[in-house]
Amino acid sequence: MERIKELRDLMSQSRTREILTKTTVDHMAIIKKYTSGRQEKNPALRMKWMMAMKYPITADKRIIEMIPERNEQGQTLWSKTNDAGSDRVMVSPLAVTWWNRNGPATSAVHYPKVYKTYFEKVERLKHGTFGPVHFRNQVKIRRRVDINPGHADLSAKEAQDVIMEVVFPNEVGARILTSESQLTITKEKKEELQDCKIAPLMVAYMLERELVRKTRFLPVAGGTSSVYIEVLHLTQGTCWEQMYTPGGEVRNDDVDQSLIIAARNIVRRATVSADPLASLLEMCHSTQIGGIRMVDILRQNPTEEQAVDICKAAMGLRISSSFSFGGFTFKRTSGSSVKKEEEVLTGNLQTLKIRVHEGYEEFTMVGRRATAILRKATRRLIQLIVSGRDEQSIAEAIIVAMVFSQEDCMIKAVRGDLNFVNRANQRLNPMHQLLRHFQKDAKVLFQNWGIEPIDDVMGMIGILPDMTPSTEMSLRGVRVSKMGVDEYSSTERVVVSIDRFLRVRDQRGNVLLSPEEVSETQGTEKLTITYSSSMMWEINGPESVLVNTYQWIIRNWETVKIQWSQDPTMLYNKMEFEPFQSLVPKAARGQYSGFVRTLFQQMRDVLGTFDTVQIIKLLPFAAAPPEQSRMQFSSLTVNVRGSGMRILVRGNSPVFNYNKATKRLTILGKDAGALTEDPDEGTAGVESAVLRGFLILGKEDKRYGPALSINELSNLAKGEKANVLIGQGDVVLVMKRKRDSSILTDSQTATKRIRMAIN
């Protein structure tokens, strides 16, 4: 107060005011500070000082012709003096007002297109709903979040090429637009921005916003998708939160969400197939998300999630070096360890072989609903500081940390046998056995862990074995904190390897990820996911398997037909018939298969019994390993719609219905496509199938030697003729076609020609 009074007294003297306003500043250090470099040192002051001048703005000389010297009120708009050091003129702020009111109007059509991200943001905010404000402690943790809604996922380099091509097409410099998304965007933007008068630099900035994902490492308590991050400052403070529902979704969030669902489904499905890695790759390459190839999205999208990272690893892409256990992401922040195999005994005297981490290490653990700091030594938990949204989330984190510590009291707390298996019915590894066991019931674990008295530390409280908070006692080494633990901020990616069972390891051989870590959470994808692989047919249930199997046969009928007659074993082993087996009652699979294969063999042996519809209908049943039995069936059962439904061997049924008039096939009442071949014409279909590529010339001609069997035909050279034995011992003369183009007509004409030749 004293000083303020003193200053007031000084200022009331006119001499003080004069010294402060008139004296020149001639101290070199000060002059240097304010004049070196282009960077403005005090922008706010500079702005106030400039705007106090009459003509603070400079403009191009041409402005004099375009703006009057005075406005309607008679105020001067520009000065006749030139700007010192340039050939521009000095202009008053009033000139800007005049220009805005009376200047030339330009077309506004490009503004919404160039400033698309802003216009869309306004729409989202207009339609969003803000709820009540709640005052409570916010557990925020820093996460890497996407701050730029509505962007494509191009890399900086790809985007740069697109921007140069759209905004500065005549500029020199090699630009290679390779990816599909680059080409599509370039074409679209060039059309949109024809005759655009907006400054090219501005257009370039705005395009960058649209094309590139921008991430920041920000403290977040709630939703992390970009439409929530853009209103972060409105929805959460230090001690308050405001409920908010976005007024629209953006494609980049939908892509992230759908990618995670697709990856989880694919990893789960691959785990149960004979060669998980090959299956996973086949599915990733044949899947589309929102019309874009999944492999393209994986290459560009930085989403870090267990299943997504397994898919990336399989494709040879780099992923984050943190590892996953129990749904938590672990990042070692200090210390080191060596791994040794050790045998331990559970409370049930079962022997487990575990890889023990020997040495002192510190980790951060980050999950969706809880985070923690863990300090451990060899098979000993030293300290665990955990924070989470609720009691349940905190308990989950504690269980994972206790199992991870490999402490003896945890292993001794096991009651009963450990025999958890994965989806492919393989036993889980010991660490995951323990984890599953305690995730089911952790009561004994918490009771046996031990408790200790605690000191009063700010922001920390204890937690008892029944998961209630306490200020006096706590589980040994465990504390609950109000503060969250930040996610690992680095975006560094490392080279990893993956084995055929989808275990991902870093270059030191540490397992970072395995299918056990993939969440079982089911969600509904925002974008359409199209799985073209037959392995994913069952994702939509038994009906989908049934329809897809038959559609596949119809689509590939031309090749299936030839294989059916020449190489049935190869046909039966096709992976497209694999999903169908799950619909056939286990006990009947082998019998059905034996029966159908015998029936097919009879068709091949006896001319005139070939029946396209029947072959299509029964083919999937022949794929199972056959049992040799004399059993005959008039109908075959499939398990769909929660019960067994019958497919009639001869004739139509609700499951499989062929309409002769329309030549269309209906499966469970749904249209499954048209058959191109007329089944009645198809009585000699085997021959017509085999004789594709041959012209039937007429009756047998002895000059061309003894009759060949159908299988021997493949040795003929183009243009060569031969007699061939068909069906019931009839012999016809054929010639191998010189051109392949006419092969298609052979199947249809062969049937008629065979009849003519025989008669």
Swiss-Prot record:
Protein family (similarity comment): Belongs to the influenza viruses PB2 family.
UniProt keywords, alphabetically: Cap snatching, Eukaryotic host gene expression shutoff by virus, Eukaryotic host transcription shutoff by virus, Host gene expression shutoff by virus, Host nucleus, Host-virus interaction, Inhibition of host RNA polymerase II by virus, mRNA capping, mRNA processing, Viral transcription, Virion
GO molecular function: RNA binding; RNA-directed RNA polymerase activity
GO cellular component assignments: host cell nucleus; virion component
InterPro entries from the UniProt entry: Flu_PB2_2nd, Flu_PB2_6th, Flu_PB2_C, Flu_PB2_CAP-bd, Flu_PB2_middle, Flu_PB2_N, INV_PB2, PB2_helical
A GO BP entry: 7-methylguanosine mRNA capping
Positions bearing the site annotation: Avian adaptation: E627
Motif range (Nuclear localization signal): 736-739
Claim: Oxidoreductase is one of the keywords in the record: no
Organism the protein comes from: Influenza A virus (strain A/Hong Kong/212/2003 H5N1 genotype Z+)
Protein purpose: Plays an essential role in transcription initiation and cap-stealing mechanism, in which cellular capped pre-mRNAs are used to generate primers for viral transcription. Recognizes and binds the 7-methylguanosine-containing cap of the target pre-RNA which is subsequently cleaved after 10-13 nucleotides by the viral protein PA. Plays a role in the initiation of the viral genome replication and modulates the activity of the ribonucleoprotein (RNP) complex.
UniProt-listed Gene3D superfamilies: Polymerase Basic Protein 2, C-terminal domain
UniProt keyword Ribosomal protein present: no
The name this protein goes by in its record: Polymerase basic protein 2
Highest rank taxon of the organism: Viruses
Subunit text: Influenza RNA polymerase is composed of three subunits: PB1, PB2 and PA. Interacts (via N-terminus) with PB1 (via C-terminus). Interacts with nucleoprotein NP (via N-terminus).
Principal subcellular localisation of the protein: virion
Cell compartment(s), UniProt: Virion; Host nucleus
Coiled coil: none
